[in-house]
């Protein structure tokens, strides 16, 4: 999707389960567009300001086991995805799956 979007196009994302999937999708979009110019920490901090909920804050308590596991997976996935995006702006030339095959 990112490859086909014009720079000024907007993306609207919504999920109603409260697990943080919308936030993660938006962070991934931000990473794909800005990894070449911003650090991972800068992108995450900006997204925390936009969405001050639990999704990106590992210091907030999560009592639901499913949410806790999802948070742990997220904290491992996002830095890896950032490295992919830094090497492949806008998801090019390698797809995520191709990059993983070379970097796993």
Curated annotation (Swiss-Prot):
Basic and acidic residues: bias regions = 57-70
Keyword Transferase carried by entry: no
Renumbered to this chain, region (Disordered) spans: 51-70
Keyword tags? Hydrolase, Virulence
Q: Sorted alphabetically, which InterPro entries does this protein's record hold?
A: Prot-tyrosine_phosphatase-like, Tyr_Pase_AS, Tyr_Pase_dom
| PROSITE patterns listed in its UniProt record | TYR_PHOSPHATASE_1, TYR_PHOSPHATASE_2
Q: Which SUPFAM superfamilies did the record assign?
A: (Phosphotyrosine protein) phosphatases II (SSF52799)
GO molecular-function terms, A-Z = hydrolase activity
Q: Does the keyword Glycoprotein apply?
A: no
Q: Which domain of life is it from?
A: Bacteria
Tell me which family the UniProt entry assigns to this protein: Belongs to the protein-tyrosine phosphatase family.
Q: Note on file?
A: This is one of the putative proteins coded by the open reading frames within the region required for AvrBs1 activity.
In Swiss-Prot or TrEMBL terms, this protein is called: Uncharacterized protein AvrBs1.1
In which organism is this protein found?
A: Xanthomonas campestris pv. campestris (strain ATCC 33913 / DSM 3586 / NCPPB 528 / LMG 568 / P 25)
Q: Which gene encodes it?
A: avrBs1.1
């Amino acid at each position: 999707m990112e490859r086909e979007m014009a720079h000024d196009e907007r993306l609207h994302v919504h999920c109603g389960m409260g697990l943080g999937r919308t936030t993660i999708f938006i962070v991934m979009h931000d990473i794909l567009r800005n990894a070449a110019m911003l650090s991972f920490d800068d992108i995450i901090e900006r997204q925390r300001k936009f969405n001050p909920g639990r999704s990106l804050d590992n210091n907030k308590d999560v009592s639901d086991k499913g949410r806790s596991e999802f948070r742990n997976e997220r904290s491992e996935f996002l830095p890896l995805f950032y490295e992919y995006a830094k090497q492949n702006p806008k998801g090019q030339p390698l797809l995520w799956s191709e990059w993983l095959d070379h970097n796993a």
